[in-house]
């Protein structure tokens, strides 16, 4: 009974309090000292210093507040981040109150602004190089190895998230093409302010609205490395087990808005560097003759140590690289290089075999000597505008190789091995592209010629049969392609038609104490292909899909007039479908899925029926049967 009475008294008290409160409404406008309305000002009614109602002003600076209060006066508070806070006491019955706020005067403290290490703007990712480079990272190549997502391989090739780059720029200009080791090895890291990764990269300006899977690198230079000649020079000396050690190198460079120049020179016997400076990462082995592929390189097994720990090198290298802009869209590039590499080393290799009773020991002592001369030349003209893209690139490379590998077996039998060959390659690649209304047109022409005038491997072995293997080769290739692309909204349909003719001649002769045989293979190959493809790109470039099929017919005519004569003529027709899907999950996360069916036939190597011997214990030949293979590939890449 007592509990019910207390509950009744409590409810009565609450009802009396509620009846005592009155409902009020307050409206008004908040403006600055110039009478301009202030948006998003915080307006509060406080009672006993506690807010009982609040709101924000609209774009016209007006506000409206409804609240309940038992008091005759309340506190009105108005605040804004850019204005001084204002508080005033008003009568509860007041229905309208306009407020003027004074601008806030803030004394800024002294701060130090630091640039972020990585900046993402659209498809461009910029690394501030000084944030990652270490104290011992003298060259650009050393510093780039520390950038997250970027990989620099032992050969100097650059990958981003596992994908090879398609272009290397210095201040937006393509000075070096695929020979960008010249830049990464010779430009000091402190000359570079940032390294930019260009995703969705298009070399041609006319393709700016086309989604691409290519990635490129652009180097941004510091102010003291631009607009005036700069250079770096270094000299090192010391003593080693075989005498004096030295290395001298220098690089002169000039980077201007219309011209770039980079010249280098190195000589030394401390480490190998000549072949590294001369690598073209975009040509690969396109200018390597067939004869070199037959003979290979004479070499011994490697010691289980880093190569630089046991070799005695002597290298020279020089390069001259010039890019000149003829106009806003036209440029001419010249790259000349020369590499000389000489390397000697001695190496002992023992192998132990046991059967539980006796132990057999095989002891090999190698003394290798290798010499290479390699000159290179590239000349490229480019016209790159919004309406057309024209490039003509002439490339040439030569290799003069001499290799010796005397070997002693079990401290008694001596084997003398040596190899010598000359290899030459030339190519001219012309590409013309333009667009008209809804069509894009493309014409391309590739001419290449490779030859190995003479290559020889000689092996003499005391008490055992010796041999001499010689080879020479010539190969001419002509590829012509015409393509039309129809564009409609987010879709494109490609219609490329291609023609390729290849003529080859390979001669090889093997002479041993008890055998003599040779190959004289002539081959002609004619290909026609039509490869239509459909492509759809999401309007916001969220994803890209491609599907196509290659319809190709090939005519081959191979004949071996050597020791084992053989002739083969054949027409073949193949269908190779493929698809590709790219999805941009975020600006830095991409998923790629691609698949293809490939139906390929063999080549001239299938008709080399007389033996080819490239070492004392290795010999190979073909059966004269044209190979055919079919494969299905499916790749999924997340990066």
PLM region spans:
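Structural motif
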Residues: 27-39
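Short Pro-Gly-centered beta-turn/loop motif in secreted/extracellular proteins
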Residues: 36, 64-72
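A short, solvent-exposed loop/turn motif at the edges and junctions
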Residues: 48-50, 75-88
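Outer-membrane beta-barrel translocator domains and adjoining extracellular loop/strand segments
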Residues: 208-210, 274-280, 344-361, 402-413, ...
């Amino acid at each position: 009974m007592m509990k019910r009475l207390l509950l009744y008294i409590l409810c009565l008290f609450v009802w009396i309090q509620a009846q005592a409160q009155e409902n009020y409404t307050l409206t008004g406008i908040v403006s600055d000292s110039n009478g301009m309305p202030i948006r998003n000002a915080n307006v509060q009614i406080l009672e006993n210093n506690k807010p009982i109602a609040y709101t924000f002003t609209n774009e016209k600076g007006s506000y409206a507040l409804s609240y309940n209060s038992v008091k005759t006066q309340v506190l009105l508070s108005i605040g804004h981040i850019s204005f001084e806070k204002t508080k005033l006491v008003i009568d509860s019955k007041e229905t309208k109150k306009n407020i003027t706020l004074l601008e806030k005067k803030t004394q800024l403290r002294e701060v130090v602004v630091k640039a972020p290490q990585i900046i993402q703007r659209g498809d461009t990712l910029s690394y501030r190089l000084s944030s990652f480079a270490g104290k011992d990272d003298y060259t650009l190549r050393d510093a780039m190895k520390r950038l997250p997502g970027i990989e620099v391989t032992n050969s100097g090739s650059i990958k981003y998230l596992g994908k090879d780059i398609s272009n290397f720029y210095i201040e937006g200009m393509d000075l070096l093409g695929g020979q960008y080791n010249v830049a990464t090895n010779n430009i000091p890291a402190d000359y570079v302010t940032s390294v930019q990764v260009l995703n969705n990269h298009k070399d041609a300006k006319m393709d700016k609205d086309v989604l691409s899977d290519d990635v490129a690198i652009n180097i941004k230079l510091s102010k003291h490395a631009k607009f005036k000649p700069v250079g770096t020079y270094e000299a090192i000396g010391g003593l080693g087990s075989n005498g004096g050690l030295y290395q001298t190198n220098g690089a002169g460079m000039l980077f201007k808005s219309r011209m770039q120049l980079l010249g280098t020179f190195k000589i030394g016997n401390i480490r190998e560097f000549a072949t590294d400076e001369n690598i073209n990462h975009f040509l690969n082995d396109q200018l390597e003759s067939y004869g070199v592929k037959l003979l290979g390189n004479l070499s011994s097994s490697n010691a289980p140590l880093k190569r630089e720990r046991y070799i005695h090198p002597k290298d020279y290298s020089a390069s001259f690289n010039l890019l000149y802009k003829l106009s806003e869209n036209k440029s001419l590039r010249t790259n000349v290089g020369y590499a000389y590499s000489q390397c000697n080393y001695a190496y002992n290799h023992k192998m132990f075999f046991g059967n539980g009773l006796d132990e057999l020991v095989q002891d090999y002592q190698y003394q290798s000597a290798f010499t290479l001369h390699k000159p290179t030349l590239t000349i490229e003209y480019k016209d790159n505008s919004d309406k057309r893209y024209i490039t003509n690139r002439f490339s040439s490379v030569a290799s003069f190789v001499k290799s010796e590998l005397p070997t002693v077996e079990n401290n008694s039998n001596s084997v003398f091995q040596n190899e010598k060959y000359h290899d030459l390659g030339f190519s001219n690649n012309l590409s013309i592209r333009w667009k008209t209304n809804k069509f894009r047109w493309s014409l391309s022409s590739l001419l290449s010629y490779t030859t190995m005038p003479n290559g020889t491997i000689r092996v003499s072995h005391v008490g055992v049969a010796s041999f001499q293997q010689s080879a020479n080769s010539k190969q001419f290739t002509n590829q012509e392609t015409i393509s039309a692309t129809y564009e409609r909204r987010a879709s494109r349909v490609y219609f490329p038609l291609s023609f390729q003719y290849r003529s080859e001649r390979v001669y090889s002769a093997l002479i041993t104490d008890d055998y003599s045989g040779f190959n004289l293979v002539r081959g002609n190959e004619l290909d026609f292909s039509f490869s239509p493809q459909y492509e759809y790109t999401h309007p916001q470039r969220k994803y890209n899909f491609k599907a196509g099929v290659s319809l190709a017919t090939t005519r081959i005519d191979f004949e071996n007039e050597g020791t084992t004569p053989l002739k083969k003529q054949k027409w073949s027709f193949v269908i190779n479908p493929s698809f590709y899907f790219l999805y941009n999950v975020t600006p830095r996360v991409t998923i790629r899925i691609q698949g293809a069916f490939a139906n390929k036939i063999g080549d001239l190597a299938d008709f080399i029926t007389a033996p080819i011997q490239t070492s004392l214990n290795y010999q190979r030949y073909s059966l004269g049967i044209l190979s055919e293979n079919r494969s299905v590939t499916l790749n999924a890449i997340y990066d």
